Amino acid sequence: MAIPYRTRQRLKRLGTLGLALIVLFLFSWLCWVIWVERYIIYTEDGAVIDFDLNPQIPMGEVAQRPVPGEGPEIHYNEGENAVNTSTDLLQMSGYYVSYDLLKEDFDNVKAKILSLPTNTPVMIDVKGGHGFYYSSELSDAVINNSVDNAAIDELIKAMRQKNLYLIARFPAFQDYHYGLNHVPSGIPFTGGGGALWMDDDRCYWLKPKDSGTIGYLTSIILELRGMGFNEVVLDKFWVPTGTKVNYTGDPIEDLTECANRLLSNVSTNSFTLSFTVSSPSFVLPEGRCRMYLNNIPARDVEMTASQTTLTEPQIKLVFIADSMDTRFDSYGVLRTIDLLDSD
C-alpha cells in the first residue's frame, strides 16, 4: 500500500524536527558538561559537584618542581657582620612586601629593599595558597610560576647579604595542592561525603591538629630557617567558619596545640616563629614568638593591645599597617614598602 504524498511530507517534517531536537539536546548537554566541570571537586573517593564554588580560577597557578641542585642556597652567617640574633626579642619597626608587589612591581620593590639600613626588618610573602614563590626543594612543594621564582631567590640572597632582619610569611593552612594530595589532612565541607571544603580563592584548608599538617608546616619553616630567615610568620592562623565548613574539633584548642607543637619543632635561641591571628585574645606559646594583627585602625591600637594576654605587648605584638600613622609606633609595626620613598 502506497503512503500518500501528504503523509510522506508530514513524516519528513517530523523526522527533520526530531533530528533537530536531538542535535539541540546533544549540544545543550555538551555545554552543560563544560560549564559544570568548574564546580567539580576531586577527592580520594571520587568526584563531587559543589555549585557554591567560586568559578574564577586564580591566575598563575601553573606550577612545576625545581630542577634538583638549583634550589635556594642555604646560608649560615655566624660572623661578626651577622644580623643581631641575641636571645632577647626587640621591638620591631620595618616593612612588608606582599605577593601583589612581588608580582607587579618587583624591580622597584627590590631597589627599595636594598636601600634599607642593615638589620631593618623586612617581611616578604614566600608562598600562597597555590604554591611556593621561591624555589623550594621540599618533596611536597609545588612552585607557583605567577611570579619570577629565580628573581625571588636572588632577592632573598641579596637581602641576606645586606644583613636585613628577614621575615618570611605564608598562609598556615590554606593550601590547594597539599589538600588535593592529602585529603585526610584537609577540612571537609558539610554534606560532601568526605570532599574538602574550598574557599573563594579555590584553596583547600588543612586541619591544624592533623599530624600531616604539622609535619608539612614544620618542613617549610625549617627550610626557610636554613635559608637564613630570622623569623617566619604563619599567616591566616585560624580555622574557617561557615555553614559549609565541617569542622568537628574545638578551633581554639586545636590552634593552640598546633602553635605549641610547631614552636617546639623549630625553636632555637635565635629564631622566631610568629602567628597572624584573628583575635588578639589568642594565647601564644611560651618562647620566641610574636602575634601579628591585620586591618586594625590606628585609633584602635591601644584598645586592641589591651585585649591581648602578652606580657610584653610592645615587643610581641606587631601591627601590619598601610599608613605612617604614629599611633602604631608604641608597638611592633611593619608598613607596606609602598610607603618608602624611592631615592
Residue ranges and their predicted role:
Residues 1-14:
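N-terminal Lys/Arg-rich, disordered targeting/topogenic segments
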Residues 15-33:
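Hydrophobic membrane-insertion alpha-helices, especially the h-region
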Residues 32-40, 46, 50, 288-343:
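Substrate-binding cleft of secreted/luminal carbohydrate-active enzymes
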Residues 75-79, 128-171, 241-270:
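Aromatic-lined substrate-binding rim segments of carbohydrate-active enzymes
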Residues 83-100, 173-222:
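Active-site-adjacent "subsite" loops/lids of carbohydrate-active enzymes
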Residues 96, 165-175, 233-235, 252-295, ...:
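Aromatic-lined carbohydrate-recognition surfaces of secreted/lumenal glycan-active proteins
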Residues 107-132, 223-235, 288-292:
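Catalytic domains of carbohydrate-active enzymes, especially glycoside hydrolases
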Residues 121-123, 147, 151-197:
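Glycine-rich, aromatic-flanked loop segments that form ligand/cofactor-binding clefts
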